[in-house]
Regions:
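Beta1/beta-strand and adjacent pyrophosphate-binding region of the FAD-binding site
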Residues: 2-15, 32
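Glycine-rich FAD pyrophosphate-binding loop
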Residues: 24-44
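Central beta-strand plus flanking loop segment that forms part of the substrate or channel wall
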Residues: 48-53, 89-91, 215-239, 295, ...
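Glycine/proline-enriched, intrinsically flexible loops and inter-domain linkers
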Residues: 370-371, 377-808
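Flavin-dependent oxidoreductases
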Residues: 18, 177-288, 295-307, 385-410, ...
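C-terminal catalytic lobe of FAD-dependent flavoproteins
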Residues: 248, 287-405, 410-414
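Flavin (FAD/FMN) cofactor-binding and adjacent substrate-gating region
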Residues: 70-73, 85, 94-164, 169-170, ...
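Dinucleotide-binding Rossmann-like beta1-alpha1 core, especially the glycine-rich loop
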Residues: 49-127, 248-253, 257-259, 280, ...
Length: 808
């Protein structure tokens, strides 16, 4: 039997129901929602149901805030009560470090528009008098948080979806996803029932990995056994109790029918179902694991002593889909039309409303309405095909869920996977490695530490994962030269007869330039937002190389392939084919020329040019570009020649004072030079004009590039806000992102990125401010861990404003 549907959603949990609800509200009626059992019978029915809105990113916080707004009005719309209890939330602090975390959260709350308050222990007790205040030094209170009944919410959303024309079919087990030519063509049910469709949404919860495999898509979710207990009614418990979290004890609480729910995130988590989930696992729980729950039980009884005598109704133990980085997995995969909405890390109830709206936008409009990068499925590289790798990373995420996560903190799990050719040399030089997209990358070198630079140590948390080697490497590069291993940079080749025309349509800059030219450009979405930014080098008439950030390779590849017109254009990922070393500084030319017979003079090899050269015995592609604001080159040899190139340059550079340097020095130098970071300073929600990148937009290149019409409208109106460079009065007060900025007592913006500029002697922060406040000299304040730091808008770039050094 065959039938047709415009979109098929697989998974009748709260996410699937929300997506169906929001699709019909966008006018799509031919929506089919399938579930292998009954609605909510996977993970939704056993969720604890807590709703906390404040998250680490603006997008996720906005999604949660939208969800609360939806839950408030859903009963009136659908005539079904979602069980929303807007009782507020309390988060306790039992240490000064935890109190610092709450102060930081308070700043984020101001930035995101949430009424988060820092309150005293006594004020917290007034709201939840059953907790023992011993050791508690304060709390954060958010009155608009709460909790709801997961099943009631799902049924209300499903009712709203049905009212809009959606069909819901239970007992429908998906056994196949049909694809052809890299896109979805249909869904197979049971033995041979087929549904023809061009769009499938995998909202399969703990089955999302298995469903993804049917389409050849890796969805790295790991089912984790999550436990909480439920008590009978307790004396003193009131319905209006706020939810309570004590992260230092790893536990959370909420009221339930006069009793309490108490759960948490243990240090020794248990995964489940990795060898396959039983086919009859519908509306079922796992057996309670009291030995594993005991540390949480002890913490819960310590904080709420009345639990010691409470009658326990049950210990709920249910699998929840977690991800290797603790973020949702959303968006369209490499298989066109196959969307994923999974891996909600026990926050699917809180996120359901926002997930439904975002996914509906993505499906209907072809793009999400917000910057969804941190949740985009394209953030996961091919190494996540390994279940062992995903499992190890996910275990770490779960076990450290309630830990304080300090700025620039590095993950420890599943390290040492992707190594550059020079890795042994970096290790021998005392590299302090960080990890990005599986690559080991030097943040700094312990061999460069210098005590006299201790005066630069940032105040508070920003000084935790910091070293005097960072300013040493920065200053040495500015004064002499630094050698940087950038092998992890993603490299993409676009080739074929139609390559140039294709890139002209995708890029806002003019890339149809002579062979050997390097162009900085963005790729925009239909609204003029920046989807990608990178350099494009023309290697031949029909061959171009794109170099983009380590973490953005799969994202940018996905965007390019999504718009690839036909077989006249070939797109290849060359990241693992070539190493990359960056050599920068005033001595860079002398060092490189000493080991190359090629003419590297300014007249022969100008800025933003590229050509093949030989360095010692190593042939490589040399790009005269910079991300640090200094004379120099990026050198791209074949991967197997990378270590020889490193050795050649280090030996040649010794008489010139060359030092190995890391990514933290790069970041401080790019701040001084005003170079933007995609995903922070520029995103799909920001356009080149307000970001100060209008110089790279070529309206007159004779091509209607994607986003051009939207940018032309913005040009005629003029930017309402601008990305501004702020200098804080105190060079040890470092803003790292999301801190609020105020002028005359009013919140006017938030920090996108920040750090220290050691050459200019300042703490630097970037923030979007209203256009009327963007004039250099304007005074503002930036809140850094609860203290308002004076700052001023400055003309950028702070370092080498005329660009003389990079063109020398």
């Amino acid at each position: 039997m065959s039938e047709d549907a415009r979109v098929v959603i697989i998974g009748g949990g709260v996410a699937g129901a929300s997506i169906a609800y929001h699709l019909v509200h966008r006018g799509w009626e031919d929506v089919l929602l399938l579930d292998r059992g009954e609605l909510t019978s996977g993970s939704t029915f056993h969720s604890a149901g807590l709703v906390g809105q404040l998250r680490s990113t603006l997008t996720l916080t906005r999604m949660m805030m939208y969800g609360v707004d939806l839950y408030r009005r859903l009963k009136e719309e659908t005539e079904l009560d979602p069980g929303w209890h807007e009782v507020g939330s309390l988060r306790l602090a039992s240490s000064e470090e935890r109190m610092e975390e709450l102060r930081r959260l308070s700043g984020w709350g101001k930035t995101f528009g949430l009424p988060l308050e820092i309150i005293s222990t006594d004020e917290a007790l007034e709201r939840f008098p059953l907790f023992d205040p011993d050791g508690v030094i304060g709390a954060a209170y958010l009155p608009t948080d709460g909790w709801l009944d997961p099943s009631s919410l799902t049924f209300a959303l499903a009712q709203g979806a049905r009212a809009g024309g959606a069909q819901i079919r239970t007992g429908a087990r998906v056994t196949g996803i049909e694809t052809d030519g890299g896109r979805v063509r249909g869904v197979v049910l049971g033995e041979d029932d087929r549904i023809r469709t061009d769009i499938v949404v995998n909202a399969g919860g703990i089955w999302a990995h298995e469903l993804g495999a049917l389409a050849g898509v890796t969805v790295p979710v790991i089912p984790m056994a999550h436990q909480f207990l439920v008590t009978k009614p307790l004396e003193g418990v009131r319905r209006e109790f706020p939810t309570l979290r004590d992260p230092d004890l790893l536990v959370y609480f909420r009221e339930d029918a006069g009793g309490l729910v108490a759960g948490g995130y243990e240090r020794d988590p248990a995964s489940w179902g990795l060898d396959g989930i039983p086919p009859d696992f519908n509306h079922r729980l796992l057996e309670g694991d009291w030995p594993r729950f005991e540390p949480l039980s002890e913490g819960a009884m310590k904080r709420v002593p009345s639990l010691q005598t409470a009658e326990i109704v049950t210990l709920i133990n249910g699998p929840e889909a977690f991800t290797p980085d603790g973020e949702f997995i959303l968006g369209e995969s490499d298989v066109r039309g196959f969307f994923v909405a999974a891996g909600f890390c026990a926050h699917g109830i809180a996120g359901a409303g926002g997930v439904g709206r975002l996914m509906a936008e993505w499906i209907v409009d072809g793009e999400p309405g917000m910057d969804a990068w941190k949740m985009d499925i394209r953030r996961f590289g091919s190494h996540y095909r390994s279940r062992r790798y995903a499992l190890e990373r996910t275990h770490e995420i779960y076990s450290t869920y309630y830990d304080i996560h300090y700025p620039n903190e590095e993950r420890r799990a599943a390290r040492g996977l992707r190594l550059s050719p020079a890795y042994p040399r970096l290790e021998s030089l005392g590299a302090e490695f960080g990890e990005k997209s599986g690559w080991e990358r030097p943040n700094w070198f312990r061999s460069n530490e210098q005590g006299s630079l201790e005066e630069w140590r940032p105040r508070g948390w920003a000084g935790r994962h910091w070293s005097t080697a960072i300013p040493k490497e920065h200053l040495a590069t500015r004064e002499r030269a630094g050698l940087f291993d950038e092998t992890s940079f993603a490299k993409i080749e676009v080739s074929g007869p139609g390559a140039c025309a294709f890139l002209q349509r995708l890029c806002d800059n003019h890339v149809d330039r002579p062979v050997g030219m390097v162009v900085y450009t963005s790729m925009l979405n239909s609204g003029g937002g920046i989807e990608c930014d990178f350099t494009v080098t023309r290697l031949d008439d029909d061959r171009f190389r794109i170099v983009t950030g380590t973490a953005f390779g799969d994202h940018d590849l996905g965007w390019i392939r999504k718009h690839r017109p036909d077989d006249d254009v070939r797109v290849r990922d060359l990241t693992s084919a070539y190493a990359c070393l960056g050599l920068w500084g005033p001595q860079a030319r002398d060092i490189l020329q000493s080991v190359s017979d090629d003419d590297l003079s300014n007249e022969a090899f100008r800025y933003m040019r590229a050509r093949e050269i030989t360095v010692g015995q190593v042939p490589c592609l040399a790009l005269r570009v910079t991300y640090v604001g200094e004379l120099g080159w990026e050198l791209y040899p074949r991967m197997e020649l990378g270590i020889r190139l490193w050795d050649t340059l280090m030996e040649a550079g010794r008489p010139h004072g060359l030092i190995p340097a890391g990514y933290r020095a790069i970041d401080s130098m790019r701040l001084e030079k005003g170079y933007r970071v995609w995903s922070a300073d520029i995103t799909p929600e920001t356009d080149p004009l307000e970001a100060g990148l209008g110089f790279a937009v070529k309206f007159d290149k004779g091509v209607d590039f994607i986003g051009k019409a939207a940018l032309e409208r913005k040009t005629s109106e003029g930017p309402s806000r601008r990305l501004c460079c702020l200098v804080l009065d105190d060079h040890t007060a470092v803003a790292l992102g999301n801190e609020p900025v105020r002028a005359e007592g009013e919140i006017v913006g938030r920090v996108t990125s920040g750090g220290q500029g050691y050459s200019v002697g300042a703490s630097i922060a970037y923030a979007y401010l209203p256009a009327e406040l963007s004039t250099p000299g304007t005074g503002v304040e930036v809140e850094v861990f609860g203290r308002w730091e004076p700052a001023r808008v400055t003309q950028e770039p702070l370092f080498d404003p005329k660009g003389d050094r990079i063109r020398s």
